[in-house]
């Protein structure tokens, strides 16, 4: 027992002091993670993380030499389902519906690289939590080794977009700076956790090979909406990793592109992101939550009322089974359950908010608590068996109403078009009987599939009025009563 206590006392100060005030996990965070890892539910999370790390290590860990493409191309053109990923088949892509390997298409091969990078990102995150939770140096070494490989490859990648051309929104590792930013947002956290076991030369290699060129690329990408929110998240993470307050300041305070500017421009007063889709709400929300967490080390508090409403609004608009109506360019079947890890952090950061506890309780009726983020929230979530009795809600600015009677729900949509991800679907209706959706909005398929523009973005595909089978014009409806 004394030896274990000594390990904890040595491990935490070593991890923090090496970072000179730039870190992603506070001393309290690390203490909570280590305490949670000793509980019965925490041990289960640790075992799950270990299993996923070992499963990844069964395949080659070498970083791809080829630049990535566009994840929306990794879909069967006939069945519109995502290909099944195989580490051993970078040029053959299996569709589970047609039982066929698709070959000879470079766009599929480039998208395979995207998926490989995503699996590596998950591997690095899991190693990060395992090192924080156990202090076992091997997990920090796994992070170091893979990041050194990435640093050696990243500087060889060419700037490119999804068409393999040089464009204003291209990346290096991926075909989009959007994906580049998302990857950096989490991987920088893993880097900082493992940094204390690295030599000066190893740190320099990772900085020069990956961190600096990635930050330079993202500083050149000045966009808007969910793209820029992720650019900012990536820049904040890179700024912390490079101990560079200038980068962090640009990401937060730039008057056109910064965090505050995007929050002011795109978040409605009712809490919804302006593109009007659960998918396109949670996508920037995760970036904003990562940003808020990352700048705590610089004594900057972004956990304000507006971010709270961004977390609370979509959670209060779900069906009884916690699925969302698939508005605009949103995946059909999107669920609050898939976002539960965000609410683990939200519950902790917003002083044990009771609504966020209710969200966690409802989500864990359907899924296991096996997320690394749960370790930071070192409490046992009380189990519930009944569906939540959440009230009807009207999102005035976003323009839709969720009407509830028991577990039955009717959703009426009339609001703004939704920008570049909007659909011509004003006055549409969706109905859920408590067990399943019986009148649906189908949302969208992958953007690389022809049906995306030929069907999913047509008025005819929605449960609303259509005149002569023609599409509605971009418009905003009205709520009359």
Where are these regions (language model features)?
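A mid-sequence, solvent-exposed acidic-amphipathic segment
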Residues: 224, 248-251, 261, 265-273
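Alpha-helical cores of eukaryotic small-GTPase signaling modules
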Residues: 234-262
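Inter-helical turn/loop segments and adjacent helix faces that build the functional surface
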Residues: 134, 194-205, 242-246, 294-303
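Extracellular glycan-targeting catalytic surfaces
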Residues: 18-223, 229-236, 256, 289, ...
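Active-site rim segments in enzyme catalytic domains, especially the processed small/beta chain
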Residues: 424-481
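Carbohydrate-active enzyme catalytic cores, enriched for enzymes
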Residues: 236, 242, 279-439, 480
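Secondary-structure capping and boundary motifs in well-ordered enzyme cores
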Residues: 119, 176-179, 227, 255, ...
């Amino acid at each position: 027992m004394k030896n274990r206590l000594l390990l904890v006392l040595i491990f935490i100060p070593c991890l923090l002091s090496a970072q000179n005030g730039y870190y992603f996990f506070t001393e309290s965070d690390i203490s909570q993670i280590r305490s949670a890892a000793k509980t019965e539910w925490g041990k289960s999370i640790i075992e799950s993380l270990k299993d996923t790390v070992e499963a990844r290590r069964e395949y080659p860990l070498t970083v791809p030499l080829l630049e990535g493409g566009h994840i929306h191309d990794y879909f069967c053109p006939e069945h519109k389902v995502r290909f099944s990923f195989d580490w051993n088949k970078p040029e053959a892509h299996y569709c589970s519906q047609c039982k066929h390997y698709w070959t000879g298409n470079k766009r599929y091969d480039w998208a395979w690289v995207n998926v490989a990078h995503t699996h590596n990102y998950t591997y690095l995150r899991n190693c990060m939590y395992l090192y924080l939770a156990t202090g076992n140096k091997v997990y920090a070494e796994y992070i170091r080794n893979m990041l050194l490989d990435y640093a050696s490859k990243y500087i060889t990648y060419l700037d490119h977009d999804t068409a393999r051309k040089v464009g204003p929104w291209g990346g290096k590792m991926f075909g989009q700076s959007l994906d580049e930013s998302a990857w950096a947002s989490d991987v920088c956290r893993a880097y900082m956790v493992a940094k204390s076991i690295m030599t000066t030369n190893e740190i320099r290699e990772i900085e020069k090979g990956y961190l600096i060129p990635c930050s330079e690329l993202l500083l050149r990408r000045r966009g808007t909406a969910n793209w820029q929110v992720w650019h900012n998240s990536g820049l904040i993470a890179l700024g912390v990793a490079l101990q560079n307050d200038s980068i962090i300041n640009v990401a937060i305070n730039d008057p056109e592109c910064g965090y505050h500017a995007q929050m002011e421009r795109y978040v409605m007063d009712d809490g919804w992101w302006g593109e009007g889709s659960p998918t396109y709400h949670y996508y920037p929300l995760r970036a904003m939550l990562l940003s808020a967490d990352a700048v705590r080390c610089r004594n900057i508090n972004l956990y304000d009322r507006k971010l709270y409403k961004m977390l609370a609004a979509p959670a209060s608009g779900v069906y009884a089974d916690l699925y969302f109506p698939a508005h605009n360019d949103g995946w059909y079947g999107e669920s609050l359950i898939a976002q539960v890890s965000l609410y683990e952090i939200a519950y902790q950061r917003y002083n044990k908010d009771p609504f966020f506890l209710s969200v966690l309780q409802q989500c864990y009726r359907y899924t296991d608590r096996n997320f690394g983020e749960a370790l930071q929230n070192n409490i046992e979530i009380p189990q519930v068996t009944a569906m939540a009795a959440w009230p009807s809600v009207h999102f005035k600015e976003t323009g839709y109403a969720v009407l509830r009677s028991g577990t039955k729900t009717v959703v009426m949509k009339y609001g703004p078009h939704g920008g570049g991800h909007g659909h011509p679907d004003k006055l549409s209706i969706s109905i859920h009987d408590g067990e399943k959706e019986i009148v649906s909005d189908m949302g969208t398929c992958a953007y690389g599939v022809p049906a995306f523009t030929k069907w999913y973005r047509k008025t005819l595909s929605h449960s609303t009025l259509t005149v002569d089978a023609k599409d509605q014009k971009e418009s905003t409806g009205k709520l009359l009563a």
